[in-house]
Regions:
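Beta/coil-rich, acidic/histidine-enriched accessory regions frequently appended to metallopeptidases
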Residues: 401-557, 661, 677-688
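Soluble non-cytosolic domains of exported or imported proteins
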Residues: 218-229, 279-284, 288, 307, ...
Length: 688
């Protein structure tokens, strides 16, 4: 997963795993989108390893009935967090069956609605706990073979872990029966329901690859899933261990919590990565795609036993994703990425004093410093030894949990390498070893130029201008040329116009995007060249360019609006939202202001994803188009499951409440709000 979480492992549960081994879970589930509830029947097969009088299954706020042990009623109780089976359990194989109901406040999400024909239902177990929607185990050390049968409206597709063994339609419902062969931790359990189509490919090793998409996004399929098959084939070969889960599926879902999630055999990812050919430049799914796939080995096959060793998942997935991108985009890309992350880590270590081997480490540390540590190790012991150690490590600990020492044992078997010193420097020290990092980075010619350029940051322009021009005229990797632009930020246009002409002439959309952000207002002398960025193959560049030109040249606003009136942009409508806001704030623009205002407000409503809504609300508030409907949509934002959007709503309401006019409007909204909205707004109204 692309954002960090913490495993919370209790001592009590650690004791249980020594006494009981849960082996197989069979569940039949019924999901009710109207009530946002889930119900089902679950059977667990387990082995009592030594006598125990209470067995616990994590179950958050669930109601249970028909609880039976080996087909006979058994005493049980619940405490709001667990189902407790009370019985003098003796050694041997047993099974427990029960029915349950729940209305989860998290981990099971209902997006859209059947009425609007845009319903999606999906789960997210990591960092949230699967035990909110399926009675299971919050402790990652308990690994189970999960088999789900999900019953839902026949007009929808249902995706879950494992292989679809049977699909039976009975009346208005379809029974989807998924089966797994190997055990996994509960946080990797998933289901996704929606109206999806799919295309299937086959890997070089014969694994079925299923890529899902919404029918409306059929034209976006190729750029969205670009390189997916190649990434799979590369990682399977590079890792040296056959993909362990039978088949592999990917499905984009709306308003997802993260960039992606590596559920076993079934990755869910954010619909923001559903892009067309232009959108691919700014929002390519490639890195997330490779990262989540790498987790199928590093995280799903072998799982860190506790959060202290979380780098064994995120650091490894980050590094192997980078190796996959190196295969696709070349060594310059690879070293440029490592250089960029080295700069971030060096800067972060000024205030972040928590090392990799610590449960409280930051995402940057777990992911990027973990990846850097692997890069150093890979370079030090050589490719052959590194691959052998990885292969042995995965095979030895397959379907188990691991710690860092387990990995080091395999390193020491293949190389005379001091893992203790390596650990002290790269995993136990919060500081970033810049000297060692730079020595490795200098193997790349582009980074040599980059490091030389870095030495000139505080050098007056006149003294370095010739060197900067040579860099821009060379065939060095484009990120180095972007660093030239970075050094021009505080210079006047007249002093840098020759450099800008060279940079613009590269026709590299990314370099030109850095130029688009260079000036608070576009210089008159740069206007004609700057206008060419309106046609660059980047929706992000176009967004910057349109606003900057509109803001800089008042007399040309209508011309710019006419030129861009059919723009849409990404699937969050970034260009359309900006265009509407600018059109509404351009006097004498020949357009139906009421219709434009209605459209912009609509983008802030429940009909759209959080990213679109936030874009629209920012424009509406920023340009003072603040109607009661806008404020209602802002209040609704505070109830959203995406914490960033919810915080955006709260922060903006707090600002608006300082104006008595808006405070009155908010108070007048209270009678028409639902209970959740009302609760959130009342809390803000009484804040001091």
């Amino acid at each position: 997963m692309k954002y960090i979480f913490l495993f919370l492992t209790s001592f009590v549960f650690a004791q249980q795993t020594q006494s009981v081994d849960f082996e197989i879970a069979n569940g039949q589930l019924f999901v009710n989108p109207k009530d946002k509830t889930i119900a089902g029947t679950v059977t667990y097969l387990f082995d009592v390893l030594r006598p125990i009088d209470t067995i616990k299954i994590d179950a958050q706020n669930m109601q249970f009935s028909d609880v039976k042990l080996n087909d006979k009623p058994v005493s049980f109780t619940t405490n709001g967090k667990q189902l407790l089976l009370i019985h003098p359990f003796k050694k041997g194989k047993k099974w427990v069956q029960f029915s349950y109901e729940a209305k989860p406040k998290q981990t099971l999400y209902f997006i859209g609605s059947e009425a609007n024909a845009n319903l999606q239902i999906w789960t997210q177990g990591q960092g949230k706990y699967t035990s909110h929607w399926f009675p299971s185990f919050d402790d990652v050390n308990e690994k189970v073979v999960f088999n789900l049968e999900i019953v839902f409206d026949k007009n929808y597709q249902v995706i879950a872990n494992g292989t679809l063994k049977e699909k039976i339609t009975n009346g208005n419902n379809t029974y989807w029966r998924y089966r797994m062969q190997k055990p996994m931790s509960s946080y990797l359990l998933m289901m996704a329901i929606g109206k999806f189509d799919k295309k299937t490919q086959q890997s070089n090793s014969g694994v079925s690859l299923e890529w899902y998409y919404e029918p409306k996004d059929a034209a976006f399929f190729e750029p969205t899933y670009r390189h997916s098959e190649a990434i799979f084939n590369f990682l399977e070969k590079e890792i040296g261990v056959k993909y362990p889960w039978g088949n592999y599926k990917q499905v984009p879902v709306r308003d997802f919590l993260y960039a992606g999630m590596e559920n076993t055999s079934a990755t869910t990812f954010s619909s923001r990565y559903v892009v067309d050919a232009v959108g691919f430049n700014d929002r390519k799914y490639t890195n997330v795609n490779a990262h989540e796939l790498a987790h199928q080995w590093f995280g799903d096959l072998v799982t860190a036993e506790s959060s202290k060793h979380h780098w064994l998942q995120e650091g490894f997935a980050t590094y192997y994703a980078l190796l996959a991108e190196k295969e696709l985009y070349g060594e310059d890309y690879f070293y440029s990425y490592l250089y960029e992350k080295a700069q971030q880590l060096k800067f972060a270590s000024r205030t972040d004093t928590i090392p990799v081997l610590n449960a409280k480490a930051s995402s940057l540390t777990f992911y990027e410093k973990g990846a850097w540590a692997l890069f150093v190790l890979h370079q030090k012991i050589g490719d052959k030894a590194f691959k052998k150690a990885i292969k042995n490590y995965l095979k030895k600990h397959a379907f188990q949990t691991v710690n860092t020492n387990d990995f080091f044992v395999e390193i020491e078997k293949v190389a005379a390498f001091d893992t203790k010193l390596f650990s002290k420097v790269w995993l136990e020290d919060y500081k970033f070893n810049t000297l060692e990092a730079n020595d490795l980075l200098k193997k790349n010619t582009a980074i040599k130029v980059q490091l030389e350029l870095d030495q000139l940051r505080n050098t007056p322009l006149a003294e370095k201008k010739d060197f900067l021009m040579k860099v821009l005229q060379s065939d060095v990797y484009y990120t180095v040329k972007e660093s030239v632009i970075f050094q021009l930020r505080k210079e006047s246009y007249d002093d840098i116009k020759e450099l800008l002409a060279l940079a613009m002439a590269t026709k590299n959309w990314s370099i030109r995007q850095k130029i688009a952000n260079l000036f608070p207002k576009v210089p008159e002398a740069f206007k004609v060249d700057y206008e060419t960025m309106l046609t660059d193959a980047s929706y992000q560049t176009q967004e910057i360019a349109l606003f900057q030109l509109w803001n800089s040249f008042e007399n040309d606003r209508i011309r710019y609006l006419d030129q861009t009136k059919n723009w849409i942009g990404f699937n969050d409508y970034n260009l359309r939202v900006l265009w509407l806001a600018l059109a509404l704030n351009t006097p004498n623009y020949n357009a139906d202001a009421a219709a434009l205002s209605k459209e912009l407000i609509q983008y802030s409503s429940l009909d759209f994803e959080a990213s679109t809504r936030q874009n629209a609300l920012e424009s509406l508030i920023g340009f003072q188009i603040i109607k009661p409907e806008v404020l209602h949509n802002l209040v609704n934002a505070t109830t959203h499951h995406l914490w960033q959007f919810s915080k955006f709503g709260r922060d903006n309401i707090r600002k608006l409440l300082k104006d008595p006019k808006y405070r009155t409007t908010f108070e007048e909204l209270l009678p028409v709000l639902n209970e959740n909205e009302k609760s959130q707004l009342n809390r803000l109204l009484v804040e001091k």
